[in-house]
């Protein structure tokens, strides 16, 4: 699933935010903090709607500054292992009339019972990506016009 928006910032400014795992709590939904962050790997601590903390490990797969970054959710031996066999996120940035077109794509490969709930999986991914774009818009502002 993929969504996009245009923000009022240069691609380099957007890159500095999306490529720094420590900045995820400022714009990615449900992330309360990031632990053990390096440019190559990090752990998101997510808060469930019920207030329970869930840890999720990520690894940077590819990066082309300031154009594209991709990371993989390390689902094996995690709470997500029962519903996902793989999960990747890609963010691309393109200059656009004084701002930046930001496109976020998420690909989840469901496992187990989740294979039989494609609409729920897609709805969750849509909420996540839309929330991330809203977070970037809050940080940078939306490009008008």
Model-derived regions, located:
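Hydrophobic ligand-binding cavity/cleft-lining segments
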Residues: 1-39
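Hydrophobic residues on conserved beta-strands that form the core of alpha/beta folds
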Residues: 2, 102-103
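Hydrophobic-ligand binding "helix-grip"
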Residues: 25-26, 33-36, 51-101, 107-109, ...
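N-terminal glycine/threonine-rich, aromatic-flanked beta-hairpin/loop signature
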Residues: 40-44
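A conserved amphipathic terminal alpha-helix motif
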Residues: 101, 108-145
